[in-house]
A protein has these predicted regions:
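Non-catalytic accessory regions flanking glycosidase/transglycosidase catalytic cores in CAZymes
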Residues: 23-235, 240-249, 278-279, 283-316, ...
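Bacterial Sec-dependent N-terminal signal peptides
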Residues: 1-30
Length: 525
């Protein structure tokens, strides 16, 4: 029997090698893939913090997003109840706040107490009302049962940073008394702190060293993160040498479609060609950490990756010279700030976003030894998975991807071998399939995620578990749309939403519809 199975697998692989590997939309071809799940190898646990989120005081993420005291949809503390209910579906495990670039001009002291005053937001050229600060964020995290993750102003001195730690975590002292006076007698127990956002250079590294040392002396239980790699940069090896002993995480940021000045909306194939980029980016960070381990600057396994800003599309914020106060009445400034709202358009977020997000999360799961946190940026509005408007919410396509992964996958990742035809677009190509297999602790219940990236063709996928071709009918959930450009908006909020179905496998073969994400549940092999 084993010989027959191996023969079948060999035929499938040979057919993939000798068939036309170009799967352009202007020709009809047989699209095939082979997924082999190594059920005899030990599955490894992953950290659910890879399903985390990020909120910044930018656009309508905070004000007009999660927090809107004047809205009839808000509770008595100002939180939008519809937003809270939707985010609970994502079981958001951790939220990073308050930035992001915003944090470069943020002073935490302005966001606590009763007599808060508006300040100039030197990063984004708006007025920050400071009505949402430390305690409001903690209240949000408590509503969502999420771990708070604070990011320090990287331009502030170490004293300001440690004062915030004292205010948040101390039982007694000047800042603990201040917190108690503000209505919070018990420590806030904030455990994860980042020293700045997207900063670099020797002076910054020395600040990381000093701040990390100071924070851990105050509270030995805190976990320290710092800027490591963003965009096309590399981690400065000196960071590990000078500050490595105080670090628990290294931060990685990447957005794969650049929207900084010019708002762009590439087509489906252009977006899908980026699907394998996260894997190589993560491997790059892992290699740099491993080099530091080999050189003895850090202990093996000491530093994990916090991919604490990620998304297919970067934020759109054309503008002015930052770090300078602007004239808020200047028509040009008003025009530039208003232009940021282009990214709120629901029609932008289609199956590209849903399937790219699945591939990003698959990359995190495959590399879960090192990557233990990831935060989609942002969680709400701009390019985030949840669009919030004055009268309600819209769950964008990638909202459903995250919701499916959080609620459908099991807790351990199994090694999986994937062989598939290539999907091409000009000189670029990616595998037509992506897959991840998860299993429960007892090794009995499986949840397998299968992504067909092809825009227009069904994918004939052969699934082998160990040495056994999968046969039978199993419960599944599928996310797709009528076309690659399908999206959700106010008038049509459910054009792209998960559907339950029964999926039939015969001799290991299952048909996956085009531009789709499918998670299938298997309880007996």
């Amino acid at each position: 029997m084993k010989k027959i199975i191996h023969l079948i697998k060999s035929i499938i692989i040979l057919s993939l090698l000798f068939c036309s590997l170009s799967c352009n939309t202007d020709q009809t071809t047989t699209i095939q893939a082979n997924v082999t799940i190594k059920i005899d190898e030990t599955a490894k646990p992953y950290n659910p913090m890879i399903f985390g989120g990020f909120l910044e005081h930018f656009g309508k993420q905070i004000y007009g997003g999660v927090f809107d005291p004047d809205s009839p949809l808000s509770d008595n503390k100002g939180f939008r109840t519809d937003v809270i209910d939707a985010l609970k579906e994502l079981k958001v495990p951790i939220i990073r706040w308050p930035g992001g670039c915003f944090v470069d001009g943020y002073h935490w002291i302005n966001g606590v107490g009763k007599n808060r005053q508006p300040t100039d937001d030197i990063r984004w050229g708006v007025i920050e009302p400071n009505t949402f600060g430390t305690h409001e964020f903690i209240e949000l995290c408590r509503l969502l049962d999420a771990e708070p993750y604070f990011c320090h102003n990287g331009m502030a001195d170490v004293q300001e940073m440690t004062d915030w730690v004292k205010y948040s975590n101390a039982n007694e002292g000047k800042f603990a008394d201040m917190r108690k006076k503000n209505g919070y007698p018990d420590p806030l127990n904030v455990k994860i702190w980042s020293v700045g956002n997207e900063r670099s250079g020797r002076d910054y590294i020395h600040k990381v060293r000093d701040a990390g040392n100071a924070m851990k002396e105050l509270d030995s239980t805190v976990l320290v993160t710092c800027s490591g790699i963003h965009g096309g940069s590399n981690i400065d090896p000196y960071l590990f040498e000078a500050a490595g002993e105080y670090l628990d995480y290294i931060s990685a940021h990447q957005y794969w479609i650049e929207n900084w000045q010019k708002h762009s909306t590439p087509n489906y194939l252009s977006c899908i060609m980026l699907s394998e980029k996260p894997e190589s980016y993560i491997k790059k960070v892992i290699n740099q950490i491993q080099s530091a381990e080999i050189e003895g600057h850090i202990n093996k396994g000491q530093i994990k990756i916090a991919f604490d800003e990620w998304n297919l599309r970067s934020w759109h914020h054309p503008g002015f010279q930052r770090f300078e106060k602007v004239d808020y009445n200047d028509p040009e400034i008003i025009k530039l700030i208003k232009a940021r709202d282009k990214s709120l358009d629901p029609s932008i977020y289609n199956l590209s976003d849903a399937l790219f997000s699945a591939s990003f999360l698959n990359s995190c799961l495959r590399n879960s030894d090192y990557i233990t946190m990831a935060n989609i940026a942002p969680l709400v509005n701009q390019t985030g998975p949840l669009y919030v408007h004055p009268n309600g919410i819209v769950k964008r396509t990638h909202f459903h991807t995250i919701e499916m992964y959080v609620n459908e996958l099991e807790k351990y990742v199994s090694n999986t071998e994937i062989i598939g035809s290539k999907l091409t677009n000009g000189k670029d190509s990616v595998s037509v399939i992506d897959a991840i297999a998860t299993v429960d602790k007892k090794g009995k219940k499986w949840a397998i995620s299968l992504v067909n990236r092809h825009p227009s063709e069904n994918l004939e996928c052969t699934v082998t578990m160990g040495n056994k071709l999968l046969n039978g009918t199993y419960k599944a959930k599928i996310l797709t749309g009528e076309s690659t450009d399908s999206y959700n908006d106010i008038e049509h909020p459910n054009q792209v939403s998960p559907k339950e179905l029964e999926l039939k496998f015969k001799n290991g073969i299952v048909q996956l519809p085009p531009h789709s994400l499918t998670i299938v549940h298997i309880e007996s092999i």
